[in-house]
């Protein structure tokens, strides 16, 4: 089996193996394909793309990050995946497999593709993106309608926490999961107390300086959209920031107020 039949066989295998999980995740994905740079059906570019994505799928069961390259210029393909550092290997592999399926469904003949889900990032391109920080695209997911009664105090607490985590992450390139820091803090303020759980992570191909640059971009976007939200997730192509606060526990002298919550997703 050669040529286009091989490419469709790979896509069908992915479809039947992972379609159920992918359908449940599709609405939570940012899918970014090149719009005009299509490739021909017989191009060796597609074979190299299939090789890279297959390699990434296989490696996703043994680690939270990998990159791969296949082919010679001008048909070289570069690819990578990055799973959230708090995922186990099975969850990472499931996410990479489902995200790869989405690439085949949405970007089959495109020269580059990027998919960001809640749990992982998968991409490929004909241009090397290794070691680079990119400010677009990015995605923000956050709750609305459930902010604290003292948003300025909370925003200050959150940004101070993220500053500390970014510093720790930039110094952790040699850890088993590089550039990943996960932390929880109990916070008390006027209307009550809550637990603040925050996480920052960079792709291991970045150096410490570029890791910091990427995370600062994420904080900047967070500050502009959702630093008062109950939870938020900011994803760039090489880094991510997430946080969540527990239900407010009123102080003895304060009154508890129940508020509704919804989800907002913004993509740029």
Curated annotation (Swiss-Prot):
Residues 1-24 form the signal peptide. The keyword Secreted applies. Gene3D superfamilies: Gnk2 domain, C-X8-C-X2-C motif. GO terms for cellular component: extracellular region. PROSITE patterns: GNK2. It comes from the Eukaryota. It is found in: Secreted. Keywords: Repeat, Secreted, Signal. Pfam families: Stress-antifung. Residues 27-129, 135-248 form the Gnk2-homologous domain. Coiled coil: none annotated. Its main location: secreted. CDD domains: Gnk2-like. Belongs to the cysteine-rich repeat secretory protein family. PANTHER family: CYSTEINE-RICH REPEAT SECRETORY PROTEIN, CYSTEINE-RICH REPEAT SECRETORY PROTEIN 5-RELATED. This is Putative cysteine-rich repeat secretory protein 5. It comes from Arabidopsis thaliana. The gene is CRRSP5.
């Amino acid at each position: 089996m050669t040529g286009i039949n091989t490419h469709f066989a790979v896509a069908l295998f992915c479809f039947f193996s992972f379609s159920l999980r992918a359908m449940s995740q599709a609405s939570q994905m940012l899918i970014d394909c090149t719009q005009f740079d299509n490739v021909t059906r017989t191009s060796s570019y597609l074979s190299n793309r299939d090789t890279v994505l297959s390699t990434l799928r296989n490696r996703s069961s043994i680690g939270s990050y990998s990159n791969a390259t296949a082919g010679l210029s001008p048909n070289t393909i570069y690819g990578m995946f990055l799973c959230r550092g708090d995922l186990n290997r099975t969850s990472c592999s499931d996410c990479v497999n489902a995200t790869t399926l989405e690439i085949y469904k949405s970007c089959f003949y495109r020269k580059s593709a990027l998919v960001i889900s809640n749990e992982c990032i998968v991409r490929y391109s004909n241009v090397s993106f290794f070691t680079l920080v990119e400010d677009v695209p990015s995605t923000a997911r956050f709750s609305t309608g459930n902010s604290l009664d003292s948003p300025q105090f909370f925003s200050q607490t959150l940004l101070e926490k993220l500053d500390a985590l970014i510093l720790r992450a930039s110094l952790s390139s040699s850890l088993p999961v590089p550039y990943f820091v996960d932390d929880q803090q109990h916070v008390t303020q006027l209307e009550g107390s809550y637990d603040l759980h925050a996480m920052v992570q960079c792709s291991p191909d970045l150096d410490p300086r570029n890791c910091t640059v990427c995370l600062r971009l994420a904080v900047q976007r967070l500050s502009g959209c959702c630093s008062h939200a109950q939870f938020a997730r900011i994803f760039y192509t090489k880094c991510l920031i997430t946080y969540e606060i527990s239900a407010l526990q009123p102080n003895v002298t304060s009154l508890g107020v129940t508020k509704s919550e919804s989800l907002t997703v913004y993509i740029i």
